[in-house]
Swiss-Prot record:
One of its GO terms (biological process) is ERAD pathway. It is found in: Cytoplasm. The keyword Ribosomal protein does not apply. It comes from Saccharomyces cerevisiae (strain ATCC 204508 / S288c) (Baker's yeast). Keywords: Cytoplasm, Phosphoprotein. Induction: In response to the DNA-damaging agent MMS. It comes from the Eukaryota. Involved in ER-associated protein degradation (ERAD). Present with 1270 molecules/cell in log phase SD medium. The keyword tRNA-binding does not apply. This is Alpha1-proteinase inhibitor-degradation deficient protein 37. The gene is ADD37.
Amino acid sequence: MAIKPTKSFQNCLEAEVPGYNDCPTVLFSIDPNSGPRSKSKQRTKSKRCVSGRLATEVLDLYGNTKTATTPPPVLRRPSVTAAQQESACEGVLVKDQGDRQLQPILCSKEELVAKINDLCVCGSKLSSKELEFYKKKLDSNITKILQNEHTKTVLSQIFNEKDKNMAVKTIKHWMVTDTTISNWCPAFLKIFENAMPN
């Protein structure tokens, strides 16, 4: 078995090393005085990237004529008024299995505050630290929560629901459809889901 001598690549051109740079040469700056040549040997001998920097304006050798353009500006979402928000959340209002609209039993503001407080003080599967964290979130927002009529209607529906799983589904659907409740409703959901039955 013969041992092949190793070749030194210290004093050679990049083109002499097979597979050294498989990237297309179009990515690197090109001498503007030298146009595209037909013979590949002449092209490989000329140095395409003397400075080693990527070119910002590349001479197109492959026939692509489109230049890069800036993307269109990002459009802002239109602001939603409270009336539009309530109309978007109408799907959350009380519906039974046959999709008939039922008359919700509305609770007063005081009744809802009492029910939320009862929910927080009854037994919970959450640790006391978690429960305190979520309770603080609710307590800090309770006055703002109960100013909105739609919120009072949905909370009344949730508290009057006999099936806890249906109430949890209602809360989750409400969270998806109404963005105005995002600062307190996840905490309410956590407390509601983990509340122990009386």
